[in-house]
């Protein structure tokens, strides 16, 4: 398996190196394109095209090129209201629905404007209502930028909990969909992420990178596997078509000495684009503490995200997502973990408070190539590698982690080094014709997991309390007499174990 994993990494690196950049239609988004003409059939140059969805708040604007064409890429699946305006012509509007990665087309013919101004009031709100029967919630950045999220280190979890009915919040960024325990999965630009995303297991995708989000709370669609409940489909931001660089910078200070800062910037051209986001957090209440007062609960997190798009031709485009996240945090202490009045079992001196910590590093690389086979069909192939490394560190004095002197307390210390890597390939073919929408595809994925544990017994009374298979004491007179005491004696730190 190690050779297969290395081959996958080399293949991905070659794709990134040779293809370099990336683009348009992805697993969770499509595109809208078309041409604007005047009554004679000539192209209308510099006409303003605007699309919007008043429910999600999504809105985009562009202008037609010299041949009258326009194109919106990275458009989330939803119905949109399209409006066209140009000097000397009457305004034009129509509804366009994006339900597939196959581009949705709009052929616009403008009429010559007159001196008469008219206002049309429509009672029909059909463009505000989706025809998709799936139980889901759509969210755009226009809403996420205003929501008071309770956790900067697990903002996506907080967002999903707030906007999705039936989703229940749990501690430390964990949440549960309808009727299932942690059976949630993410699809980020079509990349499946089905592992736990709470902040004690892994690092989430940064909220700044999300353009739109669709939370499917009912039964998951056929194309999403591994989990049985909530599916969160994420479309990331793109710089494609952003000819004038745009960005923002945010910073905040709050309770528990919480300081956060971040910036995001998008820039590009008609055929390429780059979106980059970086943010960081430092706080004295990183995890949810077991006491009313946060004790030994400091933590920090740093996020880097980069999305690169490149349109090779009218039929081919490439897209790559890069992410790196690092989080370090202390394990919150209870009053008992302060070890007040507890002696060191070896030296007899006072024990310091417990000082257990954790470090999580996450990186993700996901290139995607799309090819438009015809005006009705689109082929997509992508690859991905996501790696999580979790390190758990004990206290410098191992006896501070527990000596057994406190009822119900720990009798051991431990450390852990866990590495989880998901690598895979995915491909799908989408076909749209009139009211018919067909999608066929598959995903080949493998999980590589290594776990290393070390522990030491810190309770001097632990071995004397054990018995052998016959129920007789297996430790007496300072000597291990039988199993399990003979097996555990080398790990007893109170008796020169290591």
Task: Explain the meaning of each model-derived region.
Residues 253-282, 292-331, 357-380:
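Transmembrane beta-barrel wall of Gram-negative outer-membrane proteins
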Residues 3-7, 11-134, 208:
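Periplasm-facing N-terminal accessory domains of Gram-negative outer-membrane beta-barrel systems
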Residues 90, 126-128, 182, 193, ...:
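Structural signature of outer-membrane beta-barrel domains
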Residues 33, 48, 69, 105-107, ...:
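Membrane-embedded beta-strand positions in outer-membrane beta-barrel channels/transporters
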Residues 26, 74, 150-152, 169, ...:
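Short sequence motifs at beta-strands and strand-loop junctions characteristic
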Residues 29-31, 79, 103, 155, ...:
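Transmembrane beta-barrel architecture of outer-membrane proteins
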Residues 89-111, 115-222, 226, 231-240, ...:
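Periplasmic N-terminal accessory/gating domains of Gram-negative outer-membrane beta-barrel systems
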């Amino acid at each position: 398996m190690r050779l297969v994993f290395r081959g996958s990494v080399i293949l991905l690196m070659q794709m990134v190196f040779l293809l370099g950049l990336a683009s348009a239609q992805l697993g969770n988004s499509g595109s809208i394109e078309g041409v604007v003409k005047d009554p004679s059939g000539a192209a209308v140059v510099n006409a303003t095209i605007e699309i919007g969805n008043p429910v999600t708040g999504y809105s985009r604007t562009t202008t037609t090129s010299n041949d009258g064409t326009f194109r919106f890429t990275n458009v989330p699946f939803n119905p949109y209201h399209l409006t066209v305006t140009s000097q000397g012509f009457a305004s034009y509007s129509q509804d366009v629905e994006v339900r597939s990665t196959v581009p949705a087309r709009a052929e616009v013919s403008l009429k010559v404007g007159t001196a008469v101004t008219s206002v049309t009031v429509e009672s029909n709100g059909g463009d505000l209502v989706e025809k998709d029967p799936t139980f889901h919630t759509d969210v755009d950045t226009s809403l996420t930028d205003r929501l008071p999220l309770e956790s900067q280190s697990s903002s996506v979890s907080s967002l999903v909990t707030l906007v999705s009915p039936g989703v229940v919040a749990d501690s430390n960024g964990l949440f549960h969909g309808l009727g299932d325990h942690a059976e949630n999965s993410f699809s980020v630009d079509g990349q499946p992420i089905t592992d736990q995303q709470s902040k004690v297991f892994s690092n989430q995708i940064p909220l700044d990178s999300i353009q739109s989000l669709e939370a499917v709370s009912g039964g998951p669609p056929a194309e999403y596997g591994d989990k049985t409940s909530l599916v969160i489909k994420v479309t990331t931001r793109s710089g494609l078509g952003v000819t004038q660089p745009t960005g923002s910078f945010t910073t905040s200070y709050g309770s528990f000495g919480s300081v956060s800062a971040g910036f995001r910037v998008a820039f590009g051209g008609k055929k390429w684009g780059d979106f980059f986001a970086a943010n960081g957090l430092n706080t004295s209440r990183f995890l949810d503490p077991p006491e009313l007062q946060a004790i030994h609960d400091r933590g920090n997190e740093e996020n880097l995200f980069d999305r690169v798009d490149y349109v090779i031709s009218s039929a081919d485009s490439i897209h790559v997502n890069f992410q790196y996240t690092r989080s370090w945090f202390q394990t919150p202490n209870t009053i008992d973990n302060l070890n007040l009045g507890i002696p060191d079992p070896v030296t007899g001196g006072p024990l310091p408070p417990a000082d257990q910590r954790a470090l999580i590093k996450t990186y993700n690389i996901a290139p995607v190539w799309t090819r438009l086979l015809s005006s009705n069909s689109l082929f997509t192939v992508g690859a991905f590698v996501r790696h999580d490394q979790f390190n758990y560190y004990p206290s410098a004095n191992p006896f501070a982690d527990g000596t057994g002197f406190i009822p119900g307390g720990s009798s051991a210390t431990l450390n852990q080094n866990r590495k989880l890597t998901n690598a895979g390939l995915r491909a799908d073919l989408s076909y749209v014709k009139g009211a018919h929408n067909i999608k066929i595809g598959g995903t080949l994925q493998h999980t590589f997991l290594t776990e290393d544990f070390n522990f030491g017994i810190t309770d001097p009374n632990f071995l004397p309390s054990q018995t052998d298979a016959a129920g007789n004491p297996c430790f007496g007179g300072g000597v291990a007499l039988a199993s399990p005491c003979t097996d555990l004696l080398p790990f007893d730190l109170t008796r020169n174990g290591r």
